[in-house]
C-alpha cells in the first residue's frame, strides 16, 4: 500500500521472542485510528496472546492513539515512559491479564534495550507496576559498548 514503509520490526521481534522461548502468533498492520488499533489488539487477545507488542511511531507521534485504544478495551496504563536508555518511550499496560507493550524503535537497533529488561519478566507472568519502572533509573543507561556484553554488564542492574 502507498505510504507504508518496509517493516523492520517483525524479524527482530521474532528473533527476540525465540530467545525467550516464545512465539509471534500474529502480525497486523493496522491504521492509525483508535478503532483500527482496538481491533488489532482485540484480535491478538482473542487468539490467545499472553503479550501484545505494539510498534510503529509511538514515540514520535504526539497524536498516537494507542493509549486511547487500550483504555477503550478496558485496559490499565501502567507507564508511558521509563528512566531507561535505550527505551525511554516504552509503554506498558494490561488488558485483563494480557500485557500490552508499546515498543520504541530502539528495540530494532540496539542489542540491549528496555525490551530485554521487561519483556522476559512479563512472559514469566510477573505483573510489573509503576514502581518497578521507577527503580530502573539506577542502572538504566546502556553505555553502548563497542562489544556488547549484555546481560553481563551494569545495564538494567
Per-range role (PLM):
Residues 1-36:
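Glycine-rich phosphate/diphosphate-binding loop of Rossmann-like nucleotide-binding domains
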Residues 1-3, 57-61, 105-110:
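Gly/Ser/Thr-rich loops at beta-strand to alpha-helix junctions
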Residues 4-8, 39, 64-65, 113-114:
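Generic recognition of short, well-ordered alpha-helical segments
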Residues 25-29, 53-56, 81-82, 131-136:
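A generic structural motif
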Residues 36-89:
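Glycine-rich phosphate-binding loop
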Residues 73-157:
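Flexible glycine/proline-rich
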Amino acid at each position: 500500500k502507498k505510504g507504508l514503509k518496509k517493516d523492520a520490526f517483525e524479524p527482530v521481534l521474532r528473533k527476540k521472542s525465540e530467545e525467550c522461548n516464545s512465539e509471534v502468533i500474529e502480525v497486523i498492520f493496522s491504521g492509525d485510528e483508535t478503532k483500527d488499533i482496538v481491533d488489532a489488539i482485540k484480535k491478538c487477545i482473542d487468539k490467545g496472546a499472553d503479550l501484545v507488542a505494539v510498534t510503529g511511531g509511538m514515540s514520535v507521534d504526539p497524536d498516537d492513539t494507542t493509549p486511547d485504544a487500550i483504555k477503550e478495551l478496558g485496559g490499565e496504563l501502567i507507564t508511558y515512559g521509563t528512566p531507561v536508555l535505550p527505551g525511554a518511550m516504552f509503554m506498558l499496560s494490561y488488558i485483563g491479564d494480557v500485557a500490552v507493550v508499546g515498543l520504541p524503535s530502539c528495540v530494532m537497533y540496539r542489542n540491549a534495550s528496555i525490551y530485554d529488561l521487561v519483556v522476559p519478566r512479563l512472559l514469566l507472568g510477573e505483573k510489573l507496576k509503576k514502581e518497578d519502572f521507577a527503580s530502573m533509573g539506577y542502572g538504566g543507561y546502556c553505555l553502548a559498548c563497542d562489544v556488547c556484553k549484555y546481560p553481563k554488564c551494569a545495564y538494567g542492574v
